[in-house]
Curated annotation (Swiss-Prot):
GO molecular function: ATP hydrolysis activity; proton transmembrane transporter activity; proton-transporting ATPase activity, rotational mechanism
Taxonomic lineage from the root: Eukaryota, Metazoa, Ecdysozoa, Nematoda, Chromadorea
Family named by the database record: Belongs to the V-ATPase G subunit family.
The protein's name in its UniProt record: Probable V-type proton ATPase subunit G
Domain of life: Eukaryota
Cellular-component GO terms for this entry: presynapse; vacuolar proton-transporting V-type ATPase complex; vacuolar proton-transporting V-type ATPase, V1 domain
Species this chain originates from: Caenorhabditis elegans
Amino acid sequence: MASQTQGIQQLLAAEKRAAEKINEARKRKLQRTKQAKQEAQAEVEKYKQQREAEFKAFEQQYLGTKEDIESKIRRDTEDQISGMKQSVAGNKQAVIVRLLQLVCDIKPELHHNLTLQKKLHGQFAA
């Protein structure tokens, strides 16, 4: 009977050691998973920073800085405004003369709709 009790005790002790080993293995697996996740996150962050640096270099190379863009827009705007001012100065007198002609030189004539209506009804002979 003592050997049975001793055998049971050995089985229980072996089962306890097996459960402890399984728990330790689970803890190690969980730790490795966390570490792998942290390493992957660090790698993703490093790649993201690398791509942002490449984009900024590309943007700098092909687009220039914001100040360059701003000064180019300002120059273009000033050029367009000066062109418009020259156009106004060159055409100002002709526009004034044309407006005065239209306002002062009145040529009374019938409206074309009235003329058409009279032609259709036969009341007007041209």
